[in-house]
Amino acid sequence: MNLLFSAALTISKACQAQNQLFYLCPASMEKTLEQFRLVAGRCRDLFLKKTADYGTAWRILRPASITDQLYIKALRIRSIEEKGVQKVADSVESEFIGLVNYSVLALIQLELPEDAPLDLDTGRVAELFDQHLEENLRLLQSKNHDYGEAWRLMRVSSMTDLILQKLLRIKQIEDNAGQTLVSEGLEANFRDIINYAVFALIRLGESNTE
């Protein structure tokens, strides 16, 4: 028993030295909520500025078109990760912000009735955006309760892969007319994409300041 305890203590100290047990600390979860809100604020600011420039032209997009836009963005991120260089100016960070915002667009489109007007005023758009990000924050808190800060042990490239996996699931669900037998539906997958993209932005922000 003493040997087991000693081994566990040794592993614990080794992990702490590599900052690998950070996710177990309650203070870390508070930090995550703060970081989530900061990243969400950046996404919201861009979202509303584009709404001011273009209105709600995105309302014309059918669900599959939004999914394809998300897929293209995620594929570009993976391509840059694998090649290590990029030739187009748009940064990886901007693509992750795009993943957040397009996923919110998808959730808004799923929520609005078919007879909703194409043109929505900025105030209404801001209200809908805030509602969905708050729901994602609640989802994050619930998952952090169960999993701790395990996402902090993930590589950003793994988050990219999980986003692509979610998008492939969404494409299949859409091809099945939105029906699933035992799996999560469209909303749950879009919400997971938002949170993984936010996590990636947090990790990238931290690496840029180290």
Regions found by a protein language model. Name each.
Residues 23-210:
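Intrinsically disordered, low-complexity regulatory regions
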Residues 3-6, 16, 20, 24:
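Short hydrophobic targeting helices and cationic amphipathic motifs
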Residues 13-14, 42:
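Intrinsically disordered, low-complexity sequence elements enriched in Ser/Thr/Gly/Pro
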